């Protein structure tokens, strides 16, 4: 069934395959709480222990994308004359740089690195898409370097972030062409915030709050790449979303039990916003 059509083509009602037996965060949270499980344990229970070999490869590819991006200079192809900025950003440290400024600079440099690799046709991990591939690896690598988290802890965080991404894909969309950039960068930010919360050993309610905040403040964001290339504003948008994921983590740490909105509600709202975005406008030519 065609739900609507606007600029980027027809939008069809999706019927995604089930990955996990439970399809809402509320149900997963209740299931995990009743069994004293972490989200990564739920992923392992559903997918088997082989998930860890897969995620090891995912993490290796993510790290390598950051490394390549930080080492490469030049102009991205496509005609927009976009200069690669990750290396410059990474090296622009100052003697009087504050800890907060350094964190922002490094996280952004890592996000730029991966996003520029994507724009250049390099190997990246869709997390959840190519256009939003810089958010998750940038925050996880920064936290590993800063806090000394083990690779095993990173893999657990990736599993938690993957559950969030799957829930968004199941109940809404991760496609920018279908639902705007709220579905790409919003989903990536939500996955990253949840992964960070898992990495820091937060409770399920706190993980949910981090994911909810991260998605909520991307609602309505449009897919608007200049000349259709995943460069402007896409690369910069990855860096901004990475910082926002860290902000969502901080809020979840302090304000979880004051929240009024669930993650599931925000995901549904995102898809409702998508339908408004793709519905014919009264001003559209007949």
Predicted regions and their residues:
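Secondary-structure transition/capping motifs at alpha-helix termini
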Residues: 146-152, 199-204
């Amino acid at each position: 069934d065609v739900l609507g059509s606007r600029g980027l083509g027809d939008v069809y009602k999706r019927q995604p395959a089930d990955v996990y037996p439970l399809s809402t965060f509320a149900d997963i949270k209740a299931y995990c709480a009743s069994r004293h499980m972490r989200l990564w344990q739920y992923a392992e229970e559903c997918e088997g222990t082989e998930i860890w070999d897969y995620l090891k490869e995912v993490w290796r590819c993510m790290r390598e994308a950051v490394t390549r991006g930080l080492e490469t200079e030049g102009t991205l192809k496509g005609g927009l004359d976009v200069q690669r900025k990750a290396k410059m950003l990474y090296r622009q440290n100052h003697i009087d740089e504050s800890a907060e400024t350094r964190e922002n600079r490094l996280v952004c440099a890592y996000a730029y690195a991966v996003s520029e690799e994507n724009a250049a046709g390099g190997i990246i991990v869709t997390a959840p898409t190519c256009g939003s591939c810089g958010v998750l690896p940038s925050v996880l690598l920064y936290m590993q370097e800063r806090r000394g988290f083990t690779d095993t802890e990173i893999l657990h965080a990736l599993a938690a972030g993957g559950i969030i991404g799957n829930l968004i894909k199941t109940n809404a969309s991760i496609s920018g062409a279908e639902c705007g950039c709220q579905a790409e960068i919003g989903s990536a930010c939500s996955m990253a915030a949840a992964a960070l919360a898992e990495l820091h050993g937060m409770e399920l309610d706190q993980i949910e709050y981090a994911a909810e905040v991260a998605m909520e403040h991307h609602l309505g964001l449009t897919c608007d790449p200049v000349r259709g290339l995943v460069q402007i504003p896409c690369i910069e948008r990855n860096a901004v979303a990475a910082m926002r994921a860290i902000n969502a983590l901080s809020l979840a740490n302090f304000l979880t039990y004051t929240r009024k909105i669930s993650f599931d509600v925000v995901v549904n709202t995102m898809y409702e916003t998508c339908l408004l975005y793709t519905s014919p406008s009264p001003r559209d030519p007949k």
